[in-house]
Regions:
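Topogenic membrane-insertion module of multi-pass membrane proteins
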Residues: 1-49, 53, 57
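Juxtamembrane loop-helix boundary motifs flanking transmembrane segments in multi-pass membrane proteins
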Residues: 3-10, 87, 96, 149-152
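Residue-level recognition of specific faces of alpha-helices
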Residues: 14, 70, 159-160
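Membrane-embedded alpha-helical segments that form the functional core of polytopic membrane enzymes
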Residues: 31, 43-68, 133-137, 141-143
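Transmembrane helix-loop junctions in multipass membrane proteins, especially transporters and channels
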Residues: 38-42, 70, 74-78, 125-129, ...
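Aspartate-rich (DDxxD/NDxxD/DxxxD) Mg2+/diphosphate-binding motifs
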Residues: 65-111
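Intramembrane alpha-helical segments
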Residues: 91-164
Length: 164
């Protein structure tokens, strides 16, 4: 039996809920894509603001996805304490440990996806239709990773969706 997990406060709690340890999955593709864009287009003017907004938007989509995943996994009973080992497992565990309510998590998911959508709209005005299509795909992927009717994670398609 392990000691109970201490509830973090403030920013630490929200970083736990967002699963900040997983952010490299969003950061690395943006960094690599930006480096490739510069290397393959020597005359291209690098726009740091668009780069930073893309990075922030991608991280916020991941935050929203992680939080939505926690909500649906909690509802399905997937994120819970392992009775044999006496330890929690699955997701951030902030709901099952009572650190945050489902309402707080839904609000956080909505806010992070809304901000990422607004960033996508701005980038669309700067870059054209292709960014709009990518933004819509990213937003729908964030929601339907665990949400019905697709719930890709539960059909062994979640990893493929994450790679895309």
């Amino acid at each position: 039996m392990t000691d109970p997990i201490q509830k973090p406060e403030g920013l630490k709690l929200w970083l736990m809920a967002a699963r900040a340890y997983s952010f490299p999955a969003s950061i690395i593709p943006v960094l690599l894509g930006s480096v490739l864009a510069v290397l393959l287009n020597p005359g291209l003017q690098f726009n740091f603001i668009n780069f930073a907004l893309t990075l922030i938007g991608c991280i916020l989509v991941q935050v929203g996805t992680n939080i939505i995943n926690d909500i649906f996994d909690f509802d399905k009973g997937i994120d819970k304490e392992d009775k044999e080992l006496g330890i929690p497992h699955g997701g951030s565990m902030v709901i099952s440990l009572g650190f945050l309510s489902i309402k707080q998590m839904k609000t956080a998911a909505f806010v992070s996806l809304l901000i990422s959508f607004l960033i996508g709209v701005y980038l669309f005005t700067q870059s054209g239709m292709w960014i709009l299509y990518l933004s819509i795909f990213g937003l729908l992927s964030a929601i339907f990773y665990t949400a019905k009717p697709l719930a890709l994670k539960y059909k062994a398609l979640g990893d493929i969706q994450v790679i895309l």
